[in-house]
Regions:
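Long, contiguous binding/interaction regions
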Residues: 1-71, 86, 103-183
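Helix-adjacent hinge/juxtasegments
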Residues: 75-107
Length: 183
């Protein structure tokens, strides 16, 4: 079995389910902000294609969560609440953290850019007022395409690369990371 086949193992998600998941996530974020009045870390995955949740995608999310929690511990940022969701729309995780929102964004953006799987993670920071902080505010460039390093949004919008090519690259990155972890 090809490694990309493992990315396809799972149920396809509909556009309606993706929109519902986004709405539920936003509601949970509002609820957490009202309850804790702290910045939130919100993790989703960059998972092209119809299958957003499989054993492989859940491992990718688990790696991200472990890295985020380790970074928070290293910085002595206290995680006062967290929740994880595993729906067909993909693994999600969020946490309310006692930390300055801009510092969270800076460190999470660095993690996304420096970790071998970081390009597969979408780590959003929402400040205690409910404002989502952008990479641009930190002077960071747009997220690069998995294939050609151009602006990922432009490549996605223009459909510059096939789904198979994207999934091959994602599978390669995951394989390399897991192989190196075991060595």
């Amino acid at each position: 079995m090809k490694s990309t086949d493992l990315l396809y193992q799972g149920q396809a998600v509909t556009l309606e389910e993706m929109l519902q998941a986004r709405d539920k996530r936003a509601a949970k974020q509002r609820q957490a902000l009202n309850c804790y009045r702290l910045p939130l870390i919100s993790l989703t995955l960059v998972a092209p294609g119809a299958v957003k949740n499989s054993a492989v995608w859940r491992r990718v999310a688990d790696y991200a969560i472990a890295e985020i929690l380790a970074l928070c511990e290293q910085k002595e940022w206290v995680n006062v609440w967290e929740m994880q969701v595993n729906e067909r729309s993909g693994p999600e995780w969020m946490a309310a953290v006692c930390a300055p929102a801009m510092a969270l964004k800076q460190h999470m953006s660095t993690l996304e850019m420096s970790h071998p799987l970081g390009r597969l993670w979408d780590i959003d920071i929402i400040d205690s007022d409910g404002k989502s902080l952008s990479r641009r505010e930190l002077g960071h460039p747009a997220r690069p395409c998995l294939i050609c390093q151009q602006d990922a949004h432009l490549c996605a919008r223009g459909k510059h690369h096939t789904l198979d090519l994207l999934l091959d690259e994602i599978a390669r990155r995951i394989e390399c990371y897991e192989r190196e972890r075991c060595d």
